[in-house]
């Protein structure tokens, strides 16, 4: 049985790697998991997960994309496909593979062949107006995450306005506010994955 692939995208510094680390930490007891990370010229995100996460290092592969990171998750995702296939060969039992994109702009989206589901994450420090810009990553993702809510008072961001703008562009599609450093909002993300991706409660 093929694993479910969840793409995690968003700008540099939004919290993609931390989100993946938290999700694997709190869900790996119930699901066999693996991770592919994308960096332009390094494997820093993979290294972070190996050093700080709960998954064994042979369940994590870092891809060096070079050039534009969005190309590696959409137009030419061959390196990511190869990494996913290698992880499945190493661990035939793997059920969920997270594919973390390199930091990119608001328009970045995953190839539907590479990601069965997608999560797009931004952070409050990037500005209250980010949801209002309506990038394709935010609009088309299955789940939208607005991280670092604790910084809102310091950057003058109104979370109510961000929520309103998000609803305007996403309609009824779900979004979650998080402060991943303190795990705030994380249970909502996990619940969404369990219910909508893993279809818990339907069998």
Curated annotation (Swiss-Prot):
Compartments where found: Cytoplasm
Taxonomic lineage: Bacteria, Bacillati, Bacillota, Clostridia, Lachnospirales
UniProt superkingdom: Bacteria
Binding site for GTP: 10-17
Alphabetized InterPro entries for the sequence: CobW/HypB/UreG_nucleotide-bd, P-loop_NTPase, UreG
A Pfam family per the record: cobW
Descriptive protein name: Urease accessory protein UreG
Subunit relationships: Homodimer. UreD, UreF and UreG form a complex that acts as a GTP-hydrolysis-dependent molecular chaperone, activating the urease apoprotein by helping to assemble the nickel containing metallocenter of UreC. The UreE protein probably delivers the nickel.
Function: Facilitates the functional incorporation of the urease nickel metallocenter. This process requires GTP hydrolysis, probably effectuated by UreG.
GO MF term set: GTP binding; GTPase activity; nickel cation binding
Protein family (similarity comment): Belongs to the SIMIBI class G3E GTPase family. UreG subfamily.
